[in-house]
């Protein structure tokens, strides 16, 4: 493969990665359906906690280093493999600090020690796969990176299906299959990274990637904002589940998790938009006029997506979710309906979509620490809202506690939206569309609350479709100027 063909391409790579994410999410959804039907609700909730707990803890081992490799690797593809090896060395040293914590967690859960050990292993394997997958992307082979993700999910889902066909209800067996899929994904990523990046001159060192790679200290300092952000970001979607597990039990965690599944799938939309917008903003951050033009266009697209997402999400969940999951998650047996909880979470989805411009502006800006500050603020607010609202709800009923968990998630999404606008200095732009912003948020809240209560007030959401034409027009404007992005990439 020539150096030219190995150059990353925004358009090509984003299509491969987005497509793989969609397929992986669909396969993961099928896997969750199998788990929900194969396991008791308590076992299912325990499985979720075991995976989420170590995934959240060990994500700190990432250290933000793969992000640096993705940024600096394309400038010198021959040094990508040495850079990846250096990342593994630093992450290995960091693991020595986390090993005692992992051992303590396993020992404190003596009745579930095997499951906890498997959860820790899955998390470690996933962390180990970040560097080779990033190496593939930096070398211009996002296609193979995408295949590793899809194959991992295929293996896991097939394994779940085999166990389900054998009428297995052993949560440890399902966790073992999850680990097997993760290992296969890691091995494929390592094979691909070596095939593309590992056959060059062995004398090349990672220091040629840039000045920040001159020493371990400079690497860690340069990666620190990314490391902190990666370390705390997962808590945003998991805090409510941890608090529910503490206040109530694993049955309630399982129900809230089912409601979150479709919501998380919907978050692929803002995630894809951030990925597409970031290189555009990064290339134009020294041109304030053009920078603001991009943000304005994307903001109009976001407004146009809100009504489409609300209708699509509500329709899909209303029809398909009860078909896939057991009736106990919807008939009130566990204290609430996952469908009604999802309708409340839709408010947070809309706010997350609307936060894309300000969120990405902070990522692309000259002061990445402001982005870290935003994420810290969101996590702190999510914790405070969760402890207060879920605690108050638990004093009344299980159903109200689960509902309050959804409202806590919505509140943290609102903090992310408004905090991003303030920190990115876009409050004046916000005020220019002040009436549109306030009206949109008000109608979204009324619509989603009405959907959760199955009220005719949900029809007020149809008013949001007045935003669709401006979104379509902005999308045409953005798509009509791809040459600018190609020029930026070439430079």
Residue ranges and their predicted role:
Residues 72-87, 218, 255-376:
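Specific pore-lining/lateral-gate transmembrane helices of multi-pass inner-membrane transport
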Residues 69, 134-138, 142, 162-167, ...:
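C-terminal transmembrane helix end/exit motif
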């Amino acid at each position: 493969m020539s150096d030219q063909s190995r150059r990353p391409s925004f358009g090509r790579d984003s299509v491969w990665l987005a497509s793989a994410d969609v397929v992986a999410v669909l396969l993961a959804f099928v896997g969750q359906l199998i788990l929900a039907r194969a396991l008791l609700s308590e076992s299912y909730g325990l499985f979720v906690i075991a995976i989420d707990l170590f995934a959240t803890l060990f994500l700190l081992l990432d250290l933000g280093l793969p992000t640096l490799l993705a940024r600096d690797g394309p400038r010198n593809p021959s040094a990508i493999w040495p850079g990846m090896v250096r990342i593994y060395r630093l992450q290995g040293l960091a693991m020595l600090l986390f090993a005692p914590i992992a051992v303590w967690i396993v020992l404190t859960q003596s009745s579930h020690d095997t499951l906890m050990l498997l959860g820790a292993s899955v998390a470690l394997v996933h962390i180990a796969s970040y560097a080779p997958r990033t190496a593939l992307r930096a070398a211009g082979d996002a296609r193979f990176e995408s295949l590793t993700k899809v194959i991992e999910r295929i293996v896991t889902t097939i394994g779940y299906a085999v166990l389900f066909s054998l009428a297995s209800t052993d949560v440890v067996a399902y966790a073992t299959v999850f680990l097997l899929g993760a290992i296969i994904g890691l091995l494929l990523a390592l094979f691909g990274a070596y095939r593309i990046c590992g056959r060059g001159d062995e004398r090349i060192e990672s220091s040629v990637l840039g000045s920040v790679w001159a020493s371990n200290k400079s690497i860690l300092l340069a990666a620190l904002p990314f490391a902190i952000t990666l370390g705390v970001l997962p808590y945003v979607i998991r805090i409510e589940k941890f608090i529910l597990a503490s206040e109530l039990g694993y049955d309630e965690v399982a129900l809230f998790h089912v409601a979150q599944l479709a919501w998380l799938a919907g978050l692929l939309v803002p995630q894809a938009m951030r990925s597409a917008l970031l290189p555009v903003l990064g290339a134009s951050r020294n041109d304030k006029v053009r920078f603001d033009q991009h943000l304005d266009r994307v903001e109009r697209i976001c407004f146009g997506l809100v009504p489409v997402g609300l209708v699509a999400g509500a329709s899909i969940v209303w029809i398909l979710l009860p078909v896939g999951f057991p009736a106990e998650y919807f008939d009130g047996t566990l204290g609430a309906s996952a469908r009604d909880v999802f309708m409340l979470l839709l408010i947070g989805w809309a706010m997350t979509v609307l936060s894309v411009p300000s969120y990405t502006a902070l990522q692309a800006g000259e002061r990445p620490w402001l982005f870290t500050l935003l994420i810290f603020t969101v996590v702190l607010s999510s914790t405070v809202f969760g402890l207060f609202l879920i605690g108050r709800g638990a004093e009344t009923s299980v159903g109200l506690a689960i509902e309050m968990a959804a409202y806590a998630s919505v509140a943290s999404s609102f903090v992310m939206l408004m905090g991003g606008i303030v920190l990115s200095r876009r409050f004046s732009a916000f005020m220019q569309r002040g009436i549109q912003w306030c009206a949109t948020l008000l109608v979204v809240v009324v619509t989603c609350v009405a959907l959760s209560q199955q009220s005719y007030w949900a029809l007020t959401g149809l008013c949001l479709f007045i935003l669709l034409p401006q979104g379509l027009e902005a999308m045409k404007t953005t798509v009509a100027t791809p040459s600018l992005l190609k020029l930026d990439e070439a430079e």
